[in-house]
Structure formats: structure tokens, C-alpha cells
């Protein structure tokens, strides 16, 4: 294997690539030494081939010298920005999964060193295959990356020299389950005999370099938080803390991957162009695995961060494991590489899962780990995910962003604490969650991976190809399946919790089409998974939970059943509630002293008539749109639908508050207790008295406000509640209609990869008289490695320009039939409820003879159920808050 060049301070390689080296003492214009060798290499650099993106190095604006002049001083950190203007970014931007041009394909081939015209004549080296079949090679990293490692780590007694000087590449030609030591595969932390306490995994599909850098840089800052702990007994014994942490990136296919993101990874040393092999002796490579320990990071604003001498805020070394799957095979397959391949070798105690684009907050990963450290029966946990609001919270001006921000906040204040109090959090979001590895081993992971289509042939009828459409939708929310299987694991008493101190920030959809498409997957998956957990609740009895825990799990199941029923009939409930309130206020009757409001006795009924039938007309439009159109193709229609239902909701809210105010001010409620408390309660809670409406309003909006204040997080009430309350109707009439009408839309296929075809193959040879196989590979000089690295850094630090994407959805006719049956059942059941309540012609089936009385009773049931569920959530939230406050005083730190 190649040997890296020495760390000579005067070596021409380091001098030419020294934009990682220490800055000059002059704060304005640094002075850099130049010698003849450097001048020759600069000349050679300019005479070399064009960069992979087609522009020449002759431009003085992009010379290597100019890179040194751009520094950004973050506290204790020096970073480097590209010297060219934003308009040049298009010249260095690689295409994403849609619409690769021939020029970009040619650039990708040049980056991988496929074209003979792009190759120089180098020396070669022989590389022996592990056990005669596994290709695992060490490649020297650029001198600039080597020199960025601080001497205190590089020269430490427990350090391994090659982990800082060489990147290790392994071509995995096997299934994740076969990635084992027995088959010749290994990972550096295991080779170095290091204990992995924390495995931090980032799953990626096609996110741009800004989103990826946001997550990766946030993770590295969190690793620094852990390493800098001074009083920790655990992290400060048995070796340096950074050696107990591994950061794993799993990219779901070469084809959808943003190539600029690969440049970011190459800039910090964990990836190199031209080393991947599409097959080894005809055996197709399934995953390309890179390993390197780095101290470099790239910020979301494309600033390069490196350590400074004697600065406590420096990033520590981070053990990076980068898995680039050759084909797109879905996120669940990425988790199979994480849990069944890498985790079996590293055997981590805790696995933290993040999605690319989720930025963990300060010390958030430490807070997640502490929850497991202080509770040995904790099997899984999640943190608080909140929406990214932009600078100055300007994103809350967008109603969709504001509504989602409020929804996230209320879920973290009411829903997650309630479920945590029971010990079973129904969903630990894959974007920001953690599991104890030994807790999910066995049946939980086995059931979880039934949704991996790459296992369909092996599993047969139990696999994804043998599932009906209901089960396939269930695996759209596969994280819910894993949560249930973990709690119900036979013989164990694992529970789940929510960690308030751990926070993660994520971007949310800002336009209606993206929002609808996202919620389709969430709603269908959660609905199917909720039914799964209810139908398989009996498996809880085989677990090792205590009697008290079992009792509360039963209470939670009853609560979940009530929520499911309320959700199923919510289409009718929203219509009936809106209609009843409009009739109570806008129709002259004895209940309102024959005074219709707000447009008078003549106009109010007419306005309400048009509002109600306009409501039904737009609702019918949603079924037409959902059954035959894509949200991106009918953006205007969906936007207008959102606006209409928001206006109706605003109108109904005004009528509701008027009804309550009029009940108190107009004498509709009898406050005379002389005739007994029963008479007062009867008057207060009658369907026409306004008291029950007051209870429903207070139990909903009032609880939101009180709980937010108790959690000392009330700002979303001021900034985002308006959008959420106005958009409550849209969540049912638009999102659920679209989700159920597209129940059949489940695609699990693997796409081919032209980018994988562009990779070179590895063919083995046998030496005379030797039984071992080897491959012969080009041995590039360090100077050429550094030269190519210059181009990589320029691409990585180029200003980001968002590309335009156009995606299509392929549907299967057999799934449409099930979809139609489900939608018909949903519509008919809600229509039946509406007819039973409002139709005067149906008398023999009901206890009362008038629709008015039935409407009053139904109105009371809906409002009381809403109030009861809200109060139940509030009680659970208060319990969690008190428990957290007590545990905060007694837990180990």
C-alpha cells in the first residue's frame, strides 16, 4: 500500500496545499513562502486537465493562492470560503437525480477516472484481497487533510497512524446480513479494539450539501460537547472519549445522491473520487464503504472549519464511517446496513438515528445518551423536533410553516409527554431518535426489516412482495412497528421515553403540494401501524413488564382506540360541528331570542347556506383531485382549497366565541342556584346554552396555552397558533382525503444506476506460484492527490444553488381497487352518521323523533369527547413535567 508523504513543514506538497495550515500573524494580508518547487507545481496545476466540471484552473480568481485569503473567524475556529462570486456556482454544480446531461455524465466519469484520456501513466501497486474475495484498500488522504490533525491526537500513544493518514475503502459485494468478520469484512474501530458506546447514524437520500452539512456539522459539535466533559466518570475512563463514538453516514444510492455532497465529504477526508469499484471479479458491489478519522467540518454556509492551536472549542477527531449504496433501495435497507452489518461488528450500546437535514441542538445527543445511562430498562428515546423558522422567525409568516411549527410544539408538549408517562411512545421519529442496540436485537429488528424489499425473495410471503396493501402502508411508518415490537419484546421490560432536553431542528414543507405529499405517507402509515399495535396488543402479556406498567399500557390502548375512532369519523364531525354552530347562531330561533347573527335575520341564514354548501362542494373537489391528480400538477386548486377551508374555520370560530359570549351576557345560562345545582348544570351544559361550547374551547385552546406556559415554551402560541387554528379543517378535508384516496400508492422498486455503470471494475490476478488473489491498481503520487483535492474543495465550497426537480409517481391498478373500497367505506360510514343525525325521515332507528334533538345529543358527545381527550393529554403532560423535574435532581451526571 502507498505510504503517505512525511509531515515536513517545508515539503512542497504541504506548501502548495497549505490552506489548512496556520494563518499568518498579519491580520490583513498573510504572507506565504514560495519556492521553486511550489512554482513548478502551480504551473503544473494550471497546465493539467480541466476540472470535472469543465472549467480551467488558469483563472487567477480560483487559484490555490486565493483560497488562503478567505477566512471566517468563528469563536476559536478558522474557516475558508470560496473566492469566486455566487454567479460562478452554476459552473461547479453537479446535477441531482433528475435530468443528468451528457456533459455532467462525462464529468462524473472523469471524476471516477474511467476515461483513458483522463488517466496519466502512474506506477502500480498490488493489493491482496482479504480471504481472496474482499477488496479493502487504504488510500493516502491529501496532505492538507493530514496536516489538519492536531499533533496531540496524531502522536498519542493509543493512536493508529493510518487512521489519520489513510482513508480505508471496502467494496462490499454482499448482503448486509453477510457483512461479518467470518466473511472477511471488518471496520476500523473493531480492528483497533475500541469499545463503541455511541453510534450516530445519518441516513441520506438526495438532500443537497447545505442540508447534509447542517446535520453533519451539528453532529460534530455534539461530539465535541461529549468529549469536553470534565466531570464525567464514564467518558473519561478507558481511553479518549472520541474513540467511543462513531459517526455513520448511509447514502441511499449513487443515482439520487447529490454529487456536491460527495465533494463536501471529500473535503473532510471521508471520500475520494476514483476509488470505487462497481464489481469485484464480476460480483456486483452492493455498498461502497469509506472510513477516516477527521477533525475537519464544513458548515451549512460552505465554510471550512479546522482546529486552532490551544483552542478548547476545536472539534475533536471523529471516527467517520461512510456507506454509499450502489443502488437506491430505500431507507429501511439503509437501517439494515446500520443494524445488521455495522452494528454487529461495532456492537454499540446506543444507536442514534438522524435524517440528513435535521440539525441536533447543542448537547442534544448527550441528553439522549444520558437518558439511557440513567435508566437501564430504557429501550428507546426521542428528542424534540421543531420546525426551522429562519432568521428572525420570518418563516412563520408562511401559514403552512406556522401551522406545522405549532403542531410540532403541541405534540412535544402534550402527546409525547403523555405517551412517555405510560412508557410506550407510539412513534420515535426516524429523523431524531435513539435505541439501545441490544434492546432491538432479535424479533424487533426482524419484524422491522420485513419491509425491506431486498429481502422479499428470502422472506417469501412474509416479505414485502407477499404483503397485502394494508401491510405495505404499515411499513410507510415502519418506525411505529419497531416501537411496538420493542415494548412487546417477550421476556423483557423495555420502555420508551421522550427527552425534552434533546432538541433537533428540521426544515418543513413550505408549499401545499410538498406538504400534502409528505402527510400522505405519514397519515397512511400511522393509521395502518396504529391498527397493527391494537390488533397485536395481546403480545404485551408475553413481555416482562410489571403489573403497574401493564395497567397503564391498557389505559393507553383504550385512549388510542378512542383517538382512532375520533379520527375515522372526523370528516363527519367537522361538518356537523360547523353546521350546528352556524345554525345555532345564524338561524332565528327561541334559543337566540330570534336574533340571527352576524348578518341579521334575513341575510345570516342565506350566508350560512352558501357557506355550508360551498364547504361540501370544495370537499367533493378534494376527492376528484385526490383520485386523479398529483398535488404538484394542481397547485392552484389545492392552494385555493386551503384558503377556502381556512376562511370557513375562521368564520366558525367567530360564531363559537359569539355563542359563548351571548350565553353569558344574554341570560341563556341560569346562574340561580336556589333551584338546585342540578338546574344550573342542566342549563350550563345544554346544547343551546353555550356552556358546552365553552368547555370545548377551554379544553382545547386553553390547555394549549396553559401547558405551553408550564413548559416555559409559549412563543409558538403568539407566532403560530393563528395558522394552526385556521387550518384545523384542512387537515381532515384535504390531507386525510388525499391520503386515503392514495392508499394504493406504495412503490418499493429499485432504480438502476447509470452512475454505478460509470465506475471501473476490479479484476483479480494470481502471482506465479501463489494461491492468493490480488488486484493491480494505480499508485498516485501525493502531489497528484493534492492537485485533485484543490478542485474538490472548490466544488464543495461553491455557493449553493437549488436545482429544479420534477418527480413522477407510478401506480399499480390492483392497489387502486383496495383504495376505492377503503374510500367508499370511509365516505359511507361518515355519510351514515350525518344522515342518522340530521335527517327527519329516519325515526324508527333512533331514540328521538326529531333531528334537532339528535343533533344536540351528537353535538354534546363530540364536544365532551374532545374535551375529555384534551384533558387526558394535559394530565399526562403534567405528570411527565413533574417526573422530569424530580429526576433532574437525582439523576447521575
From Swiss-Prot:
<keyword id="KW-0808">Transferase</keyword>
<keyword id="KW-0812">Transmembrane</keyword>
<dbReference type="Pfam" id="PF01644">
    <property type="entry name" value="Chitin_synth_1"/>
</dbReference>
<feature type="transmembrane region" description="Helical">
    <location>
        <begin position="721"/>
        <end position="741"/>
    </location>
</feature>
<comment type="function">
    <text>Polymerizes chitin, a structural polymer of the cell wall and septum, by transferring the sugar moiety of UDP-GlcNAc to the non-reducing end of the growing chitin polymer.</text>
</comment>
<feature type="transmembrane region" description="Helical">
    <location>
        <begin position="606"/>
        <end position="626"/>
    </location>
</feature>
<keyword id="KW-0961">Cell wall biogenesis/degradation</keyword>
<dbReference type="InterPro" id="IPR029044">
    <property type="entry name" value="Nucleotide-diphossugar_trans"/>
</dbReference>
<dbReference type="GO" id="GO:0004100">
    <property type="term" value="F:chitin synthase activity"/>
</dbReference>
<feature type="region of interest" description="Disordered">
    <location>
        <begin position="1"/>
        <end position="43"/>
    </location>
</feature>
<keyword id="KW-1003">Cell membrane</keyword>
<keyword id="KW-0472">Membrane</keyword>
<dbReference type="Pfam" id="PF08407">
    <property type="entry name" value="Chitin_synth_1N"/>
</dbReference>
<dbReference type="GO" id="GO:0071944">
    <property type="term" value="C:cell periphery"/>
</dbReference>
<feature type="transmembrane region" description="Helical">
    <location>
        <begin position="690"/>
        <end position="710"/>
    </location>
</feature>
<dbReference type="GO" id="GO:0006031">
    <property type="term" value="P:chitin biosynthetic process"/>
</dbReference>
<dbReference type="InterPro" id="IPR004834">
    <property type="entry name" value="Chitin_synth_fun"/>
</dbReference>
<dbReference type="GO" id="GO:0071555">
    <property type="term" value="P:cell wall organization"/>
</dbReference>
<keyword id="KW-0328">Glycosyltransferase</keyword>
<dbReference type="GO" id="GO:0005886">
    <property type="term" value="C:plasma membrane"/>
</dbReference>
<feature type="transmembrane region" description="Helical">
    <location>
        <begin position="640"/>
        <end position="660"/>
    </location>
</feature>
<feature type="transmembrane region" description="Helical">
    <location>
        <begin position="861"/>
        <end position="881"/>
    </location>
</feature>
<protein>
    <recommendedName>
        <fullName>Chitin synthase C</fullName>
        <ecNumber>2.4.1.16</ecNumber>
    </recommendedName>
</protein>
<feature type="compositionally biased region" description="Low complexity">
    <location>
        <begin position="21"/>
        <end position="31"/>
    </location>
</feature>
<dbReference type="InterPro" id="IPR013616">
    <property type="entry name" value="Chitin_synth_N"/>
</dbReference>
<keyword id="KW-1133">Transmembrane helix</keyword>
<feature type="transmembrane region" description="Helical">
    <location>
        <begin position="565"/>
        <end position="585"/>
    </location>
</feature>
<feature type="compositionally biased region" description="Polar residues">
    <location>
        <begin position="10"/>
        <end position="20"/>
    </location>
</feature>
<comment type="similarity">
    <text>Belongs to the chitin synthase family. Class III subfamily.</text>
</comment>
<dbReference type="InterPro" id="IPR004835">
    <property type="entry name" value="Chitin_synth"/>
</dbReference>
<feature type="transmembrane region" description="Helical">
    <location>
        <begin position="822"/>
        <end position="842"/>
    </location>
</feature>
<dbReference type="GO" id="GO:0030428">
    <property type="term" value="C:cell septum"/>
</dbReference>
